[in-house]
A protein has these predicted regions:
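Cap/insert and terminal regions of metallo-dependent hydrolase folds
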Residues: 110-186
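Core dinuclear metal-dependent hydrolase active-site scaffold
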Residues: 1-2, 63-121
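Active-site neighborhood of phospho(di)ester-bond hydrolases with catalytic His/Asp-centered motifs
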Residues: 7-15, 36-39, 100-104, 123-125, ...
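Active-site environment of divalent metal-dependent phosphoester hydrolases
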Residues: 16-20, 43-44, 84-85, 108-110, ...
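Active-site neighborhood of divalent metal-dependent phosphoester bond hydrolases
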Residues: 41-61
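Active-site metal-binding motif and surrounding structural segment of the metallo-beta-lactamase
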Residues: 1-37
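Short, well-ordered alpha-helix to beta-strand connector turns
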Residues: 7, 56, 119-120
Length: 186
């Protein structure tokens, strides 16, 4: 790991609780860290969750398709399709390294595809196994939400997409946002 004194920011993709639950307590402990998200995302998380309005003190407003700096990194937020408030993926550059972060997306949009194809390092969700979701205990409305274009990517869609974009310039792929109920790391 790296010392927390070197961390300069938290990039929020959207306002769902699994992404923002501990952000305020974290920045209260590490006061030098900024919270980077769009103003709409910040308003959504303050409206939807019992997080202190003091989070605004740490907010660094960003706008999609406009590069911004976080320490030695240049980052850019871009549109992804999901059912949160003003969802974003991130394209992060540090020297020759290009990192795309795409979690919580129901399908690969044109903008997400554009940035993921440029990445040397890719974080992409493989949220659920379709058979496990279908056989699982979630109510039908939740299963439909997860499967929708504004929901999550299933393993087969993620695998097919990765096979399509793979090149020698892609150094590492990190599968993330795996459902604990509808997926396995295998």
């Amino acid at each position: 790991g790296i010392p927390m004194e070197r961390v300069r920011g938290i990039l929020l993709t959207h306002d769902h609780s699994d992404h923002v639950r501990f952000v305020y307590s974290f920045v209260r402990k590490y006061r030098h860290i900024g919270v980077y998200c769009t103003p709409r995302t910040l308003n959504g998380l303050l409206r939807r969750h019992s997080i202190s309005n003091r989070l605004k003190d740490y907010h660094r407003a960003i706008y999609k398709e406009h590069p911004f700096r976080v320490g030695n990194f240049t980052a850019l937020a871009f549109e992804v399709l999901h059912d949160g408030t003003d969802n974003a993926g991130f394209f992060i550059t540090h020297g020759p390294h290009h990192i795309a972060v795409c979690t919580d997306l129901g399908c690969v949009s044109e903008r997400a595809d554009f940035y993921m194809r440029q990445a040397n390092y890719l974080m992409i969700e493989a949220n659920y196994d379709a058979a496990m979701l279908a056989a699982g205990s979630y109510p039908e409305y939740l299963k439909a939400r997860i499967r929708s274009d504004n929901g999550h990517l299933d393993n087969c869609i993620t695998a097919a997409y990765l096979a399509e974009i793979y090149s020698d310039s892609l150094k590492n792929i990190f599968l993330c946002h795996l459902s604990k109920d509808n997926n396995t790391p295998e």
